[in-house]
């Protein structure tokens, strides 16, 4: 039996590209499905050019591959179910459906995985916003489709209600009580259907709702770090996870609150390529293939900086002046404002000395 596989990746962005690179290093072949022929993954894999919801193209990908995976959660789960056998998609479509809908996600996290989440309620129309205790702050989020701050409205006072009511009338939403947190953190976990590998706790700093800087290890107590890891592993085991998952959390002075999950490698885990003995992409490929997972070790404290479209030249200059920094550019042809173009990783004992772009 050939131990080298053909892996199909749905999505050819930077995550698909880095998954493909990890798979190729292990000796596997990669075919990617993406709507554009010049996507980042096209530099390292064959690409089937078709929309993500093209059932015929998904079927073609499935027919040519031993195993399928996806680089982002907005994939047509019904379309996948129609053409892919369960054994061919180890991550499954249940995880997709949970992570595509905040209502399903909150229910899973709170009631099935048994982890702490912010107090929330389901909102089906603006009527559900009547009688809010406006001494508290809330975040109204659409149940589906939101990313990088889109599809969200913070409610701090009555002045914010008209916009919130408009959002609530446009789509199903989740209303969360705002968490007064000290830090935003995340934990990457990878599973092979049985065992779970866990990465160090990451501290995340956002600018305009886009990740700007990740610091590893997160600057929280050992007790809170252990709790965050245990919660992430608890979620992974409840899911019988195959592949990599990111659990995004808030750290308060004495507790960890789970915010959301991403069923794939995550921007905040990119540091692991250089800073750990195995990256989140390595363990993702091992996980979806059902292979044994390593114990993850962090070589030294590290910082990752995102390179957005407006930062490209600044990042190139930075690496020229700091030759120990690792620059990753994803090969996107157009450097749009706030578009993720690459990242920089470097080892740093004092994260505050490393300024964001």
Go through each PLM region and give its residues:
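ATP-binding N-terminal substructure of ATP-dependent carboxylate-amine bond-forming enzymes
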Residues: 1-100, 104-107
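Short, conserved charged micro-motifs
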Residues: 128-131, 160-163, 312-317, 350-357
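Phosphate-binding core of ATP-grasp and ATP-grasp-like enzymes
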Residues: 167-220, 226-258, 262-270, 278, ...
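Short glycine-/aliphatic-rich beta-strand segments at the starts of folded cytosolic domains
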Residues: 297-308
């Amino acid at each position: 039996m050939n131990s080298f596989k053909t892996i199909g990746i749905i999505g050819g962005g930077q995550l698909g590209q880095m998954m493909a690179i990890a798979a190729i290093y292990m000796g596997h072949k990669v075919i990617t499905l993406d709507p554009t022929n010049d996507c980042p993954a096209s530099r390292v894999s064959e690409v089937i050019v078709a929309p993500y919801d093209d059932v015929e193209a998904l079927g073609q990908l499935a027919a040519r591959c031993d195993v399928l995976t996806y680089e982002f959660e907005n994939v047509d789960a019904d379309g996948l179910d129609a053409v892919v056998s369960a054994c061919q998609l180890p991550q499954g479509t249940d995880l997709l459906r949970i992570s595509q809908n905040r209502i399903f996600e909150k229910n899973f996290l709170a009631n099935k995985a048994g982890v702490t989440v912010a107090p929330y309620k389901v909102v089906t129309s603006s009527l559900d916003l009547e009688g809010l205790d406006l001494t508290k702050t809330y975040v109204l989020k659409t149940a589906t489709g939101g990313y990088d701050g889109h599809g969200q409205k913070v409610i701090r006072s009555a002045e914010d209600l008209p916009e919130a009511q408009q959002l609530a009338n446009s789509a199903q939403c989740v209303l969360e009580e705002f968490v007064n947190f000290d830090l935003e953190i995340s934990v990457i976990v990878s599973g092979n259907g049985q065992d779970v590998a866990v990465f160090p706790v990451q501290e995340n700093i956002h600018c305009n709702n886009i990740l700007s800087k990740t610091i590893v290890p997160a600057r929280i107590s050992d007790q809170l770090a252990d709790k965050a890891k245990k919660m992430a592993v608890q979620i992974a085991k409840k899911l019988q996870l195959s592949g990599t998952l990111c659990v995004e959390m808030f750290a308060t002075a004495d507790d960890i609150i789970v915010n959301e999950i991403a069923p794939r490698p995550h921007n905040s885990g990119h540091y692991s390529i250089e800073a750990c003995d195995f990256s989140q992409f390595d363990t993702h490929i091992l996980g979806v293939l059902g292979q044994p997972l390593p114990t993850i070790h962090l070589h030294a404290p590290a910082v990752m900086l995102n390179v957005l479209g407006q930062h490209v030249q600044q990042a190139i200059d930075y690496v020229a002046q700091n030759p120990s920094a690792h620059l990753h550019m994803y090969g996107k042809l157009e450097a749009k404002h706030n578009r993720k173009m690459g990242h920089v990783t470097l080892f740093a004992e004092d994260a505050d000395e490393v300024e964001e772009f």
